[in-house]
Curated annotation (Swiss-Prot):
Homodimer. Keywords: Amino-acid biosynthesis, Aromatic amino acid biosynthesis, Glycosyltransferase, Magnesium, Metal-binding, Transferase, Tryptophan biosynthesis. It comes from Pseudomonas syringae pv. syringae (strain B728a). Binds 2 magnesium ions per monomer. Its EC number is 2.4.2.18. It catalyses: N-(5-phospho-beta-D-ribosyl)anthranilate + diphosphate = 5-phospho-alpha-D-ribose 1-diphosphate + anthranilate. This is Anthranilate phosphoribosyltransferase.
Amino acid sequence: MSTPMDIKNALNRVVNQLDLTTEEMSDVMREIMTGQCTEAQIGAFLMGMRMKSETIDEIVGAVSVMRELAGKVELKTLDGVVDIVGTGGDGANIFNVSTASAFVIAAAGCTVAKHGNRAVSGKSGSADLLEAAGVYLNLTPVQVARCIDSVGIGFMFAQSHHTAMKHTAGPRRELGLRTLFNMLGPLTNPAGVRHQIVGVFNQALCRPLAEVLLRLGSKHVLVVHSQDGLDEFSLAAPTFVAELKNGEVTEYWVQPEDLGIKSQSLYGLAVESPAASLELIRDALGRRKTENGQKAAEMIVLNAGAALYAADHATSLKEGVALAHDALHTGLAREKLEELGAFTAVFKQENEA
């Protein structure tokens, strides 16, 4: 039994460009997440890791500890339960595509356990958007599970489930850089989903994160980054995909046209606030009275369709997109959004009583 790695030894390693093993990284992360390190040590470690560049082993070690310390959501089954999530940090300030897509996925009859947070770098995070839509966020894990069982979709507010993250908040904010933690959120779904779309801020992360999820037991995952820099499937450019399926990772590019959708510019899809994002999404999921609403609907269908494929609810990306198109155009997705708001309002009364 080797002695556990501590943060001082880890800093010494990292500053010399030496990698940590999965176990060593887990030791250091446990020290950080249980409040045993100073903010200076945490900041130095995150910066050193970023400059050295995190290995698959190190990310696996970090994710394992975060999953272990998370407030878990226990579901009856994880078969076909999907999450659609991005690292954020793509700098595009586009409306909340993955959150809007989640309601289309649920409308198509697939179960969604959505993990998300407030905006870090963008104008509107998934939590900000849902709050604007009247969804109550401060749920217990049991209440989230009830949402998922009854509505077919539930939202896990990252800060409620990953309370150990509070130790890193100061250093992360003060560094103002993307760090290891930007990658960890999408990999630490509190329900333990094994089907996922993960959007990343850099194409170079696609394959490594697919490999990390393979090591951690995921079944069918698409890790994506578009050529125009988005952490999701783009309407305006090809998207690079690292797909984990049947225990193997394959890489390919996909164009909107391959999936039966016409490419178009992203003009009109950027938002300045959660309220503006919500207005665009309500139009896209509703009557599509504006040109931007129609375009947003296409972008949502593209991403929701990919998630239906990752959930094995469809046998191909193209079939997933066709199913998502039908689910959006029935108006059911808009109803799901209102239904989740109404369902969580009951818990709000209970929790605040």
